[in-house]
Amino acid sequence: MSTESKCPFNHAAGGGTTNRDWWPKQLNLKILHQHSTLSDPMGENFDYAKEFKSLDIEAVKQDLRNVMTQSQDWWPADFGHYGPLFIRMAWHSAGTYRTGDGRGGAGAGQQRFAPLNSWPDNVSLDKARRLIWPVKQKYGRKISWADLIVLTGNVALESMGFKTFGFSGGRADVWEPEEDVYWGSETTWLGGEERYGAQKKMQQPGDGTLVAEPENHANEESRTASGERNLENPLAAVQMGLIYVNPEGPEGVPDPVASARDIRETFGRMAMNDEETVALIAGGHAFGKTHGAGPADNVGPEPEAAGLEEQGLGWRNKFGSGKGGDTITSGLEVTWTSTPTKWSNEYLENLFGFEWELTKSPAGAHQWTPKNGAGAGKIPDAHDPSKRHAPSMLTSDLALRFDPAYEQISRRFLNNPEQLADAFARAWFKLTHRDMGPLARYLGPETPAEELLWQDPIPSVDHALVDDQDVATLKAKILASGLSVSQLVSTAWAAASTFRGSDKRGGANGGRLRLAPQKDWAVNQPEQLAGVLKTLEGIQSEFNAAQSGGKKVSIADLIVLAGNAGVEQAAKNAGQHVTVPFAPGRADASQEQTDVESFSFLEPIADGFRNYQKGHYKVSAESLLVDKAQLLTLTAPEMTVLLGGLRVLNINVGQSKHGVFTDQPGTLTNDFFKNLLDMGVEWKATAGGTDTFEARDRKTGAVKWTGTRVDLVFGSHAQLRAISEVYGSSDAHEKFVKDFVAVWTKVMNLDRFDLA
């Protein structure tokens, strides 16, 4: 008898048609359950900061310096030095950051995983990471991939004669792809149709030659576009799979002026101003080259699509040797300077020293070469010492000359090389550290002493902190001040809920709720907020004036303490006595320490926890709630119990009654869940839309409650309903209060990295 199974076995666990296939618009809660101990091989007790502090950074840097010039046959170094490749690796790791939601960036080593490891803009960076694997292997748990990638970029710059601004460690690795980052809706690599909508396509310019005089372009909208392109938020790249812009020009059209618009938009969304943008491009392109030795159809599949035998590498190239002088990466074949492994100002000297005309790379990509054969023989070949070339430029390079604002900065850097060096050092540090959060997270001996405005500085605590007796006294004064539970809780929530786990910005520390721009945000109800802050500042002044020995309470601490007092009073109103944990130690930042423009990105377009939405968006209100919860590092159960508690504490913006499913607001009960799950009412959309709903008594038809999509999703979505049933049960009140206090405390302390 044959032992072969008669039943075909065609699929393994996890395969087949998924719920997402059946219901593509189903609310995605998986983004709330990423990076747990189930995916982390390091164990629950692993302390990366402790390990990093034991690292001999100078020894690591020496090992990296050795790697720089030890060219490997399997991937030869351009010009005998891997430095430019490593700069690109670090740049592309950090350059995914965007200000809109703080996601992306170098902070978790995501370049190792899909989709970033397979983006078209990251071709050959798989080799860069393999080149430094021996260093990672040697130091193991003491340095993360996230830190090593950035450090390697710094060492590359230093090894080629550039003085960097510094380096800080502290980026802990994650062990799976981030599922919360929205990279766009396009379904093809290098697509851009969704992020720009049905906007007019760029048209090819006429003669293919750029006129030399920049003033001819000063008042020109564009030679290729009739208006601004509107890039979808929060995206910061013009096409799917690019870090910033298309180096050939918008949609591949070689128009430097139009390219400047894309550069300004994308770099601006990564928190870079014009000077920082010029410095990054001019500084980065002082080194190395691009690669376009032959047609792109010679290049095989990306790492995620390559065969097992490729062992995580991709883009196998069948053109010539497939490496060295035959490398194909971007399809562009550009070398900017005659000293591509040495810091110099030659990039700008060449940019302004030649007049440029359009040509094509061997791969057929648009690039620029000096007119009339100028510069021939100036540039060395990356692999053949017998060959010489003329300098060349990208369309995005020429944007620095023919955009009026960029041109002014570029000429200043051309005439003042020391200004470029300083600006590039600072911009590079900002690029590679922008998503690390406050200085409390910076580790290592090379951390700069200078405090920078974009780091959202907070003063050090220079006074004695309040003790338990002081806390009790202050809470009593707060509760006797006439402020309601709703006012106390909503104010603390407004302060703490600005935190973003993505780039570690925001939170209650710093007391910036009292400063511009936060004090004026509509979501914070400025008129009510001003009154609450005035009362709390009075309590603060009275308390501090009565102390001896320098003891003080900051307004940042007092705002959180007031929220805690409100929660405790609400629990007491419900018959439960709880003490909400409180850890003093927050300090108050000044307006001068607060970059208003930078902080404006923290203003929520929606806060489902306060039933607030600034406008009408394509994204559903419930999806925006989950997005907010993910930024607050909440799980689905935490999100559920927190929202249910905040609803009955009546903190909705504008005192809206939507979702306040209780007859006793200000009392910490599980009424939200009990009444949402009540089968004695029937929910129907209100007239004119599907954003608000009414619950009518099934017998009388009377309206009992009103709610939003954010409220109703907790009864509609199967997973959220299952959690809601836990908190809506008859025996759940004690658990509900306990769990609410725990997650409330978590949110209040999200930015307290000093407590870790």
From Swiss-Prot:
Write out the residues that bind heme b: 285
Which sites are covalently linked via Tryptophyl-tyrosyl-methioninium (Trp-Tyr) (with M-270)? 91-244
Q: Report the PTM annotation.
A: Formation of the three residue Trp-Tyr-Met cross-link is important for the catalase, but not the peroxidase activity of the enzyme.
Enumerate the Pfam families for this protein.
Answer: peroxidase
InterPro entries reported in the protein's UniProt record: Catalase_peroxidase (IPR000763), Haem_peroxidase (IPR002016), Haem_peroxidase_sf (IPR010255), Peroxidases_AS (IPR019794), Peroxidases_heam-ligand_BS (IPR019793)
Q: What class of enzyme is it?
A: oxidoreductase
Cofactor binding note from Swiss-Prot or TrEMBL: Binds 1 heme b (iron(II)-protoporphyrin IX) group per dimer.
Q: Where is the active site?
A: 92
Q: Which reaction does it catalyse?
A: H2O2 + AH2 = A + 2 H2O; 2 H2O2 = O2 + 2 H2O
GO biological process terms on file: cellular response to hydrogen peroxide; hydrogen peroxide catabolic process
Q: Which cofactor does it need?
A: heme b
List every stretch annotated Disordered: 198-230
| Cross-referenced Gene3D superfamilies | 1.10.520.10, Peroxidase, domain 2
Q: Where is this cross-link: Tryptophyl-tyrosyl-methioninium (Tyr-Met) (with W-91)?
A: 244-270
- Residues the record marks as site: Transition state stabilizer: 88
| Lineage top rank: taxon | Bacteria
Q: What does this protein do?
A: Bifunctional enzyme with both catalase and broad-spectrum peroxidase activity.
Its family remark reads: Belongs to the peroxidase family. Peroxidase/catalase subfamily.
Assembly, per entry: Homodimer or homotetramer.
Task: Please identify the protein, giving its name as recorded.
Answer: Catalase-peroxidase
Q: Which organism does this sequence originate in?
A: Pseudomonas syringae pv. syringae (strain B728a)
